[in-house]
């Protein structure tokens, strides 16, 4: 229904509308999908940015648009926004070895074979320990970083699931910000009968 909040749409409401408002079902869906993530799997980590992008943080309200009837919204706190950012950041982790050796198993086998030499005596001579990168060292470093990223992800997700953002509906929203919605006056069609009025016919002699 057309109308306006008029002069009541001022003050604190203007500041709060710039915050992150999330519709209840959208919020529940995001939490459900994040909960299903198996962080140890790269394929699952790659899904996280898309999930976060599906979070809609705008509320369709302005001076001439009333808070949606029948909808429930949450205003996310600073702590919740930081947790979401931490989850997004953690998803960018990739194992160093996977990035460096982004080749198929056959290529990796051939590369490892070429690092060995077989002299006439049949003795295999391998590169001295410490010459070049250490695969074991890289794996340990990578696993340590994965643990850090996994901890950040699960801790932040626990923060979001444990939060209890206030549920806001049309009535509580308008009460909170002292808003008064005034419906626009109906416009009578030309030559028609105004709502609630009478139709008069004048006979001119």
UniProtKB/Swiss-Prot annotation:
<dbReference type="InterPro" id="IPR036417">
    <property type="entry name" value="TMV-like_coat_sf"/>
</dbReference>
<dbReference type="GO" id="GO:0005198">
    <property type="term" value="F:structural molecule activity"/>
</dbReference>
<dbReference type="InterPro" id="IPR001337">
    <property type="entry name" value="TMV-like_coat"/>
</dbReference>
<keyword id="KW-0946">Virion</keyword>
<keyword id="KW-0167">Capsid protein</keyword>
<feature type="region of interest" description="Disordered">
    <location>
        <begin position="98"/>
        <end position="130"/>
    </location>
</feature>
<dbReference type="Pfam" id="PF00721">
    <property type="entry name" value="TMV_coat"/>
</dbReference>
<feature type="compositionally biased region" description="Basic and acidic residues">
    <location>
        <begin position="98"/>
        <end position="111"/>
    </location>
</feature>
<protein>
    <recommendedName>
        <fullName>Coat protein</fullName>
    </recommendedName>
</protein>
<dbReference type="GO" id="GO:0019028">
    <property type="term" value="C:viral capsid"/>
</dbReference>
């Amino acid at each position: 229904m057309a109308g306006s909040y008029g002069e009541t749409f001022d003050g604190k409401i203007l500041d709060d509308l710039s915050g992150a408002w999330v519709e209840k079902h959208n919020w529940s869906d995001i939490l459900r999908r994040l909960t299903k993530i198996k962080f140890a799997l790269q394929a699952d980590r790659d899904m996280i940015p898309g999930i976060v992008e599906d979070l809609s943080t705008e509320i369709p309200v302005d001076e001439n648009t009333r808070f949606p009837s029948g909808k429930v919204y949450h205003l996310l706190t600073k702590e919740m926004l930081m947790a979401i950012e931490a989850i997004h950041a953690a998803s960018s982790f990739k194992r160093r070895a996977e990035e460096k050796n982004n080749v198929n198993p056959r290529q990796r086998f051939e590369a490892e074979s070429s690092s060995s030499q077989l002299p006439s005596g049949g003795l295999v001579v391998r590169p001295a320990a410490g010459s070049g990168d250490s695969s074991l060292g890289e794996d340990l470093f990578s696993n340590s970083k994965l643990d850090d990223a996994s901890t950040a992800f699960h801790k932040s997700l626990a923060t979001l699931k444990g939060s209890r953002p206030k549920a806001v509906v049309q009535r509580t929203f308008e009460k909170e910000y002292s808003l008064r919605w005034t419906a626009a006056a109906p416009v009578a069609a030309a030559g028609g009968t105004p709502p609630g009025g009478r139709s008069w016919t004048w006979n001119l002699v």
